[in-house]
């Protein structure tokens, strides 16, 4: 590992740092040493973060015990974790991760953390002088024993760095396999719903006859940061950006100063807002040979930031407040295709997912013994970066329980179901098939616009449209009751646009089970 990933530990931006915090050559960037709670008098490098940068995991050559005092260059590399404390605006004291992550007697290096912070990718060297990529999962508050990823991610050649795209299915990784364009190349592969990986594809538009390294995909899903010895590098590795557009990666653009110098510049990670990131610097004013630094980008007013929504929160039992282990399935409502799925933390019920803008998302939340809950997130592509904290309650499957179907949409002033509704209706159909004796009422509600008579008629027709769709999916009509309530059961004021939107809804209630 020391010979394979030493380049990642040598992000030399010393010419631009003269103290713990200073402005770089560019007035839009501020560099700040993370301090002694994270850094040590040994080398600390390879920072990785989750999407909101609340968790920082990194690699260090510091001794694990008082008896283990060795020269920095001979010390084993191990993985440490630190968590951000909002009240102190700083990271907690770094803690050595357990043997499930740090295999004793080997070099272990953190190379990527998933957006939700529940999947950690690890580099480990092997007995043949090569290296492979391993993965550990967060189960409650414990990390699982790391498992070596299968082919086509790992090969007999050397694999050094990797990361997941926001969908959690697509992986980008660096490999020195002979089928590449030369040296270390960036490759990609996708895992299907059964856990099988596709063939690895070489990113030919980014790779060169020289070496590429340190691949990282931003939570927006379309911005790649990587390093290369080519593409007009100033010397050694330089950092570059490429954008994904219509399935193709753009020509790499150098990040310039202060990131690129005459030395090797590798491995930059940014949070979802793209206002801050972390990397390693060998600075004479730091604590050790290499320290971890916060890089803050001073965003101009005209810059909207990444076009994405960072949605996070917890799933819980509505009655008891107990946090739940649940599954979130995210659908592109316009196409009905699944974007991704993820699980909440089994101990805290928390989740976090990044949703690129310009898509109408339907999010279904399910847990054993509970009715599904649905969330609609529809952010225009022009909205820029938005962070939303949303706790999601689930109701047990009980007679009298009512839930709102948040992803049911009708044509304006009509009862015609729009295509965006089909995924939600299919979930309801599946629920009824899984509970073969369940009878439900489908109710539709309007706001106060229009006459009472008209609103009752429209809502009845809309409720019937839902019933008709479920019948077409094989649900017996005897199990379905359509009821239009018009404006008679508001859940919010009709004096505001927001209130009227809440009142326009479709619900189902369990009549018997």
Residue ranges and their predicted role:
Residues 1-25:
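Bacterial Sec-dependent N-terminal signal peptides
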Residues 21-314, 318-319, 359, 385-387, ...:
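Short, conserved micro-motifs composed of acidic
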């Amino acid at each position: 590992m020391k010979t394979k990933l030493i380049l990642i530990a040598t992000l030399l931006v010393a010419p631009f740092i003269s103290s713990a915090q200073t402005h770089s050559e560019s007035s839009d960037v501020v560099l700040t040493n993370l301090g002694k709670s994270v850094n040590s008098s040994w080398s600390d490098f390879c920072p990785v973060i989750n999407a909101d940068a609340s968790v920082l995991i990194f690699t260090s050559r510091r001794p694990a015990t008082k008896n283990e005092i060795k020269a920095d260059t001979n010390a084993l590399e191990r993985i440490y974790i630190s968590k951000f404390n909002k009240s102190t605006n700083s990271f907690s004291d770094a803690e050595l991760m357990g043997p499930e992550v740090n295999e004793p007697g080997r070099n272990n290096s953190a190379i990527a953390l998933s957006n939700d912070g529940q999947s950690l990718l690890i580099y480990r060297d092997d007995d043949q002088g090569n290296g492979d990529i391993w993965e550990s999962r967060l189960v409650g508050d414990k990390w699982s024993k790391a498992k070596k990823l299968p082919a086509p991610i790992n090969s007999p050649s050397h694999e050094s760095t990797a990361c997941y795209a926001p969908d959690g299915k697509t992986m980008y990784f660096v490999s020195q396999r002979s089928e590449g364009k030369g040296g270390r190349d960036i490759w990609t592969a996708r895992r299907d719903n059964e856990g099988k990986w596709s063939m690895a594809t070489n990113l030919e538009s980014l790779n060169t006859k020289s070496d590429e390294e340190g691949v990282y995909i931003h939570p927006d899903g379309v911005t790649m940061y990587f390093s290369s010895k080519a593409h007009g590098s100033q010397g050694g590795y330089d950092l570059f950006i490429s954008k994904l557009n219509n399935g193709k990666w753009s020509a790499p653009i150098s990040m310039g100063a202060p990131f690129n110098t005459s030395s090797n510049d590798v491995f930059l990670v940014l949070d979802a807002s793209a206002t801050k990131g972390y990397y390693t610097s060998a600075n004479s004013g730091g604590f050790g040979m290499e320290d971890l630094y916060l890089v803050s980008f001073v965003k101009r007013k005209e810059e909207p930031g990444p076009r994405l929504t960072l949605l996070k929160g917890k799933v819980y039992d509505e009655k008891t407040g107990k946090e739940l282990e649940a599954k979130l399935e995210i659908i592109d409502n316009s196409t009905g295709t699944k974007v991704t799925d993820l699980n909440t933390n089994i101990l805290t019920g928390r989740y976090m997912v990044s949703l690129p803008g310009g898509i109408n998302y339907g999010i279904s939340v399910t847990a054993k013994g509970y009715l599904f809950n649905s969330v609609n997130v529809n952010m225009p592509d022009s909205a820029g970066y938005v962070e939303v904290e949303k706790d999601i309650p689930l109701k047990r499957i009980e007679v009298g329980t009512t839930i709102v179907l948040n992803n049911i949409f009708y044509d304006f002033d009509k009862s015609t179901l729009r295509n965006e509704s089909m995924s939600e209706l299919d979930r309801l159909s599946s629920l009824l098939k899984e509970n073969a004796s369940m009878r439900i009422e489908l109710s539709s509600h309007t706001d106060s616009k229009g006459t009472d008579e008209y609103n009752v008629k429209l809502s009845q027709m809309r409720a019937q449209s839902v019933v008709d769709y479920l019948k077409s999916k094989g649900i017996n009509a005897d199990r379905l009751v359509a009821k239009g309530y018009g404006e008679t059961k508001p859940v919010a004021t009709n004096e505001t646009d927001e209130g009227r939107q809440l009142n326009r809804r479709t619900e189902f209630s369990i009549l018997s089970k």
